[in-house]
Amino acid sequence: MEYDYRADYTYDASGMGRLHRKGAPETICLSTPGTDTPRYKINVENAIPFAVAPELKVDGKWLSGADRDAVHKIQKHSAGKESATAEISCTWQDKHQVVTDYQLDKNGMKITVSGKGEVGLMIPAFTFDGKEKTVISNSGRTLTIRYRGWECRWELQQGKISDTGKTGYNRNGHYRIFRAENNDTLTAVIRIERQK
């Protein structure tokens, strides 16, 4: 797991930009965040900056932790032999804030976003590497990306997952941007496993 809290937007975006599992394709969850102003070009228009990032709905508009004006601060973190945790605040316009708790262990990554009102979590779903396409399914509570014999599964404990209709890209390929959302608190668990 890697979290960028001061992104260089010519290259990437702030938020969790990397989650790998040994043996799985690096890109199945996310290997590097994406920017809306890359130095490289791929045939995707109107791309947005993306990462696994908290979001907050204010006055009918979603504020994203991947946006340039979001300020991320590490509140606490720890890492052991078999687990790691981090608590990170994300603030917009010095007044709107969410706190995100990340817990990583052998069972996957648990992410909890807490704030006032509608909170969200940006989910970049890998779609195309230039040669192969992934298979994506969304039940509203579980989003699954299948690729090269593996699957990345995002499961919500409450709320819903929906397609934002937005896209992004990085040096690894194309992404469809989904959002998990709920009131006040949202918990998602990410698991990367071999397909059954």
Q: What kind of region is each of these model predictions?
A:
Residues 1-120:
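Catalytic and substrate-binding regions of extracellular carbohydrate-active enzymes
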Residues 3, 7, 11, 25, ...:
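Intrinsic disorder/low-complexity signal
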Residues 19, 84-91, 111, 143-146, ...:
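Generic recognition of long tandem-repeat/solenoid scaffolds
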Residues 118, 122-127, 139-140, 146-196:
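Beta-strand-rich recognition/accessory modules
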Residues 134-136:
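Hydrophobic alpha-helical positions that pack around
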